[in-house]
């Protein structure tokens, strides 16, 4: 029971705010490799095994909202961009993994000022996060790792 309480206390330090967190009974090296493979469809910007940090570069895509304002006008493009951050941490007998997507939309605010024409944060895509988490789970299951 004390081990479980200790694990839960440590998990708060090991996760990213708002992330999808999981714990695996598996070696750090195996989980690290699986985490890296799980985001291989995106360009990697940071890959620091010692710190347990993987960050992808921004990828741009068509936005989900098409118009704005009372007249439902097109703004300065309908673009979104996203990047993934994966944190892998050693915790006693388990390894934790936190997956978080940062997503932004171009020019959602009205006006023509410099302040209105920039990337604005929006909610992450649960589907994109789930895709990475499911890939990770599948890869670790193939290697015999147990989720705890």
Which role does the model predict for each range below?
Residues 14-148:
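Ser/Thr-rich, low-complexity intrinsically disordered terminal regions
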Residues 1-13:
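Sec-dependent bacterial lipoprotein signal peptides
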């Amino acid at each position: 029971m004390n081990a479980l309480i200790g694990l839960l206390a440590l998990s708060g330090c090991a996760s990213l705010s708002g992330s999808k967190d999981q714990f695996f009974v598996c070696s750090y090296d195996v989980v690290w490799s699986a985490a890296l493979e799980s985001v291989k469809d995106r360009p990697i910007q940071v890959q620091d095994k010692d710190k347990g940090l993987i960050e992808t570069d921004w990828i741009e895509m068509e936005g989900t909202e098409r118009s704005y304002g009372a007249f439902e006008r097109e703004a300065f493009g309908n673009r979104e961009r996203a990047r993934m951050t994966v944190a892998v941490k050693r915790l006693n007998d388990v390894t934790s993994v936190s997956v978080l997507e940062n997503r932004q939309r171009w020019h959602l605010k009205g006006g023509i000022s410099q302040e209105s024409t920039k990337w604005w944060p929006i909610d992450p895509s649960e589907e994109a996060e789930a895709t990475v988490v499911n890939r990770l789970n599948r890869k670790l299951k193939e290697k015999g790792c147990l989720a705890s």
